Amino acid sequence: MVLQNDIDLLNPPAELEKRKHKLKRLVQSPNSFFMDVKCQGCFNITTVFSHSQTVVMCGNCQTLLCTPTGGKAKLTEGCSFRKK
């Protein structure tokens, strides 16, 4: 556990910065991102928002790519992704 007095304010640990609210970080950055999701059936790549609020289907084979949750969208098992 890191005490508040032991933190270097100019170079805070990455794990502490990641847990902070997006506006209270040393450099403000959003928690959301766009990602390329590869379909497991036809290998078609679809761009999906990480916090998508709707079900995303593949454009070619109509396979379910991700389902919404309360926060980040849950990818279907077998789908691979990369951040944009």
From Swiss-Prot:
Molecular function, one GO term: mRNA binding
Cofactor: Zn(2+)
InterPro entries (UniProt xref): Ribosomal_eS27, Ribosomal_eS27_Zn-bd_dom_sf, Ribosomal_zn-bd
Pfam families: Ribosomal_S27e (PF01667)
Keyword annotations from UniProtKB, A to Z: Host-virus interaction, Metal-binding, Ribonucleoprotein, Ribosomal protein, Zinc, Zinc-finger
Cofactor note text: Binds 1 zinc ion per subunit.
Biological process, per Gene Ontology: translation
Zinc finger (C4-type): 39-61
Keyword Zinc found: yes
Gene Ontology cellular-component terms listed: cytosolic ribosome; cytosolic small ribosomal subunit; nucleolus; plasmodesma
The keyword Ribonucleoprotein is assigned to this record: yes
UniProt family annotation: Belongs to the eukaryotic ribosomal protein eS27 family.
Assembly, per entry: (Microbial infection) May interact with Tomato yellow leaf curl virus (TYLCV) and papaya leaf curl China virus (PaLcuCNV) C2 proteins. This interaction prevents activation of Jasmonate signaling, thereby facilitating viral uptake by insects vectors.
Name recorded for this polypeptide: Small ribosomal subunit protein eS27z
